[in-house]
Swiss-Prot record:
Region of interest called 15 X 4 AA repeats of C-C-X-P, as start-end residue ranges on this chain: 35-234
Family membership noted in the UniProt record: Belongs to the KRTAP type 5 family.
Positions of Sequence repeats: 35-38, 41-44, 47-50, 105-108, 115-118, 133-136, 143-146, 161-164, 171-174, 181-184, 191-194, 201-204, 211-214, 221-224, 231-234
UniProt keyword annotations, A-Z: Keratin, Repeat
Domain of life: Eukaryota
Identification of the protein by name: Keratin-associated protein 5-5
Gene name of the record: Krtap5-5
Quaternary organization: Interacts with hair keratins.
GO biological process: hematopoietic progenitor cell differentiation
The UniProt record lists the keyword NADP: no
Residues spanning the signal sequence: none
Length: 241
């Protein structure tokens, strides 16, 4: 019996041809041994010998023909063409990858720190990461929004997996904040519009001469001014005496 493209014998294992284009690593999927003539030569996908049908391996490159099928089981082919399903499921694929694999031939893995999102990579343990195959993480300061990164503790951050934070000056908008994670601020002069503010977070200002329109203002935040001839439109003054 001779090896593929080699002179000399191979022995029963067909290994160690050691020639260019021979059976060694170029077999790709036949493992350490190679197929010897007259059975068939190594193919890039799997070696064909009368062991299993070509259909179960997804077919050997170049066709099986007289080879009569694939050597051994699908597992010995080093991954069969046509997907893991034809090889018998996830088991024959060697299980799941270390980090939450979502492979077509594996079931979702249990949660591993290596597949957690950055904000949950530590502190919560195995139930932390917000992955498709993991449970939501508990709240950590590292995954809090900037405005709530301090002062509120673990219940601060406005994250999908965290409780809303309490109101802090650092996370309020400049004057009169209306943030989703803060209570409405009380009205401060610094956050009122120039004169008579009508902000959503401020009470209406009382009417001041400085914030009234020139004469007789009728603003939504000011009381009607006393009627003065100087501020009435021509011929339109309806001053009560």
């Amino acid at each position: 019996m001779t090896c593929c493209g080699c002179s000399g014998g191979c022995g029963s294992s067909c290994g160690g041809c050691g020639c260019s284009g021979g059976c060694g690593s170029s077999c790709g999927g036949c493992g350490s041994s190679c197929c010897c003539k007259p059975v068939c030569c190594c193919k890039p996908v799997c070696c064909c010998v009368p062991a299993c049908s070509c259909s179960s391996c997804g077919g050997c490159k170049g066709g099986c023909g007289s080879c009569g099928g694939c050597k051994g089981s699908c597992g010995s082919c080093g991954g069969c063409k046509g997907g893991c399903g034809s090889c018998g499921g996830c088991g024959s694929c060697g299980g799941c990858k270390p980090s939450c694999c979502q492979s077509s031939c594996c079931k979702p893995c249990c949660c591993q720190s290596s597949c957690c999102k950055p904000c949950c990579s530590s502190g919560c343990g195995s139930s932390c990461c917000q992955s498709s195959c993991c449970k939501p993480c508990c709240c950590q300061s590292s995954c809090c929004k900037p405005c709530c990164s301090s002062g509120c503790g673990s219940s601060c951050c406005q994250s999908s997996c965290c409780k809303p934070c309490c109101c802090q000056s650092s996370c309020c908008k400049p004057c009169c904040c209306q943030s989703s994670c803060c209570k409405p601020c009380c009205c401060q002069s610094s956050c009122c519009k120039p004169c008579c503010c009508q902000s959503s977070c401020c009470k209406p200002c009382c009417c001041q001469s400085s914030c009234c329109k020139p004469c007789c203002c009728q603003s939504s935040c000011c009381k009607p001014c006393c009627c003065q001839s100087s501020c009435c439109a021509p011929v339109c003054c309806q001053c009560k005496i």
